[in-house]
Amino acid sequence: MKYFIKTYGCQMNINDSEKIKGILQTQGYEPATREEDADLVILNTCTIREKPDQKVWSHLGEIKKLKSINPNIKIGVCGCMAQRAGYEIASKMPFIDLVFGTKNIHHMPKLLEDVKVGNRAIEILEEEDPSENILDSYPTVRDNSYCAYVTIMRGCDKECTYCVVPFTRGKERSRNPQSILDEVKSLVDSGVMEIHLIGQNVTAYGKDIDYPFYKLLENISKIEGVKRIRFTTGHPIDMTDDIIETMANLPNMVNHLHLPFQAGSDRILELMKRNYTKAYYLNRIEKLKAKIKDITFSTDIIIGFPTETEEDFQHTLDVVQTVEFEQVFSFKYSKRPNTPAYYMEDDLTDEIKTDRIKRLLEIQKAITSKLMQRYKNTVQKVLVEDKKGNTYIGRTTTNVWCNITSSQDILGKEVEVLIAKAGFQSLDGVVQNIL
């Protein structure tokens, strides 16, 4: 039997898909390279915005055609959209065999047994399952041999008014620290060099178990063989001085941080229930820059939140120009069911949102181009993750992709690279030294 998984959305979904692959392979499934060749197709969905929902509905329409050609193929839907609207999906798409949410991935073996005997398996848990941590002990099939996602917590307590995550992922639950350290040790033993800690709000890790995030960073840093540590995503209000000091002091912390600010206007931030101000966010950035040499930033921005004025938008542009992010992920606001903002009037036209996002991206393009040119003729540490043709591909400690020329096999190695060319999205360079 063969499976095919299509993953939408964030790093958490990617890691969940890696867990699902591991479960499937323990059940005797092998990976297929195409949906058409699979006995089981699973869509791991995202519902953070309206657009991912639309993509899933469209994809399900295509899969319906596939099922009409091959009635024996089994179709599954999981992830955040399934958690939010799983019963609706099952009702509208009766050809779907399997639906489960974000809180019961570990139930897959039982659900698969139901599907194998011809039953539909539809299970959406409203409450967190105390046994969900067993998922952390399941085998994981990773696409990257040298960089690995490690889930350290699930859920979010922040209750931002636009965000569906508290509904789809539940309350914050920190994973047992020893379980995390054991997984990291196992990954390093298998050849992994970079540990990427993930969660809906990793900087809130440990609040429910009296084990602060900075302490977890310190203990992971001590594990022999961990070359790099990065984490995604944090919340500015939880980016404490202790975390910043720890990041600055650990030799294997990367000097890049993704820190969403969402909007620059204090009025809009209050409506979003972000619980910080523009000044507070800029203070965190200033402290990080002062403590961590050459640190770079990326961020998320929502454009056109209800009642956003031109003056509000100018505050957002001011943050972008002040911080000088290397990368910005910007999105037009779209109301999501099960959020407080769903009941606010979406009073900005699509034309206004499109105009503002275009202006933002024009400013960001100039900033990125300027920052990328600073890499030219410098030597950067790069962890080599892939090879395409004769070119090796890796990332700098500042999270920039680099295409590398080398006469030696450097796959899976950390190398020093002399940057010869700086493009808009990547660098080109030649190996100077293998570390």
Swiss-Prot record:
User: According to the lineage, what is the superkingdom?
Assistant: Bacteria
* Cofactor binding comment, as recorded: Binds 2 [4Fe-4S] clusters. One cluster is coordinated with 3 cysteines and an exchangeable S-adenosyl-L-methionine.
- Residues binding [4Fe-4S] cluster 2: C156, C160, C163
One Gene Ontology cellular component annotation held by this UniProt entry: cytosol
Claim: Transport is one of the keywords in the record? no
Q: Which SMART domains match?
A: Elp3
State its Enzyme Commission number(s). Answer: 2.8.4.3
Q: Recite the UniProt keywords alphabetically.
A: 4Fe-4S, Cytoplasm, Iron, Iron-sulfur, Metal-binding, S-adenosyl-L-methionine, Transferase, tRNA processing
Instruction: Identify the cofactor(s).
Output: [4Fe-4S] cluster
Q: Which residues form the TRAM domain?
A: 373-433
Q: Where would I find the MTTase N-terminal domain in this sequence?
A: 1-117
Major subcellular location class: cytoplasm
- State the Gene Ontology terms under molecular function: 4 iron, 4 sulfur cluster binding; metal ion binding; N6-isopentenyladenosine methylthiotransferase activity
Residues annotated as binding [4Fe-4S] cluster 1: C10, C46, C80
Any one Pfam family here would be: UPF0004
Compartment annotation? Cytoplasm
**Catalytic activity from the UniProt record:** N(6)-dimethylallyladenosine(37) in tRNA + (sulfur carrier)-SH + AH2 + 2 S-adenosyl-L-methionine = 2-methylsulfanyl-N(6)-dimethylallyladenosine(37) in tRNA + (sulfur carrier)-H + 5'-deoxyadenosine + L-methionine + A + S-adenosyl-L-homocysteine + 2 H(+)
Enumerate the spans annotated as Radical SAM core domain: 142-370
Q: Briefly, what is this protein's role? A: Catalyzes the methylthiolation of N6-(dimethylallyl)adenosine (i(6)A), leading to the formation of 2-methylthio-N6-(dimethylallyl)adenosine (ms(2)i(6)A) at position 37 in tRNAs that read codons beginning with uridine.
Which family does the similarity line name?
Answer: Belongs to the methylthiotransferase family. MiaB subfamily.
Q: How does it assemble?
A: Monomer.
Name by which UniProt lists this protein: tRNA-2-methylthio-N(6)-dimethylallyladenosine synthase
